[in-house]
């Protein structure tokens, strides 16, 4: 069984690389639009906030709880966002994919489905995950639609799961894909990616 991370995962359009402190400036540039952070629990819009965000991610990786990535666009080598494995449970082989964000010019295209494909393929096929979860704010209908389009199943709602930056209480919706569902999800995702790019993911 391969390690879940840290690892580099390469597709046809993007590459996921382990997130490090050297990426701070590129991440700050990619994340400078405030609308990116509307539904996120952290908003690293300054150099100091980004450094703190990266430090927390590094600590979580060192503890084996999370494996954060930067998303690099292959056509120009530009960092266009971030995603990560979190809630890593080695003994049970379960993991969550989350903390995903992209610069606005990467919204609505091939970037997110390819990133999720790379992460899920590695989790299920190399790490032998039995369950991959995805969560989002109950009010984030765009994210929910994107998760459903991946083929994930709705599991339920966690009430008052966290407090938003504005002080309101957040209900979190939970989706998942389990081991037995992955082959079908994979085929549909590969077709979607091939239709979008004209080549294999």
Specify the residue positions occupied by each region the protein language model found:
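Conserved GNAT acetyl-CoA-binding A-motif
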Residues: 125-135
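Short Gly/Pro-enriched loop/turn and capping motifs at secondary-structure junctions
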Residues: 139-140, 161-162, 181-182
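Conserved glycine-rich acetyl-CoA-binding loop
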Residues: 103-117, 130, 138-144
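Conserved catalytic-core motifs of GNAT/GCN5-like acyltransferases
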Residues: 135, 153-167
């Amino acid at each position: 069984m391969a390690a879940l991370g840290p690892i580099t995962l390469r597709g046809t359009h993007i590459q996921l690389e382990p997130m490090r402190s050297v990426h701070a400036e590129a991440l700050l540039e990619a994340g400078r639009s405030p609308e990116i952070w509307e539904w996120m629990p952290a908003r690293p819009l300054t150099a100091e906030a980004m450094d703190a965000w990266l430090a927390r991610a590094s600590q979580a990786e060192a503890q084996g709880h999370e494996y954060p990535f930067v998303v690099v666009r292959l056509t120009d080598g530009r960092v266009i966002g971030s995603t990560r494995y979190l809630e890593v449970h080695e003994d049970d082989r379960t993991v969550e994919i989350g903390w995903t964000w992209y610069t606005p010019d990467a919204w609505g295209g091939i970037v997110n489905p390819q990133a999720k494909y790379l992460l899920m393929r590695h989790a299920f096929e190399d790490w032998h995950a039995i369950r991959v979860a995805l969560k989002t704010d109950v009010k984030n209908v765009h994210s929910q639609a994107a998760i459903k389009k991946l083929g994930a199943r709705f599991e339920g709602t966690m009430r008052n799961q966290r407090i938003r930056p504005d002080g309101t209480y957040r209900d979190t919706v939970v989706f998942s894909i389990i081991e037995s569902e992955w082959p079908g999800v994979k085929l549909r995702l590969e077709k979607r990616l091939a239709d979008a790019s004209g080549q294999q993911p």
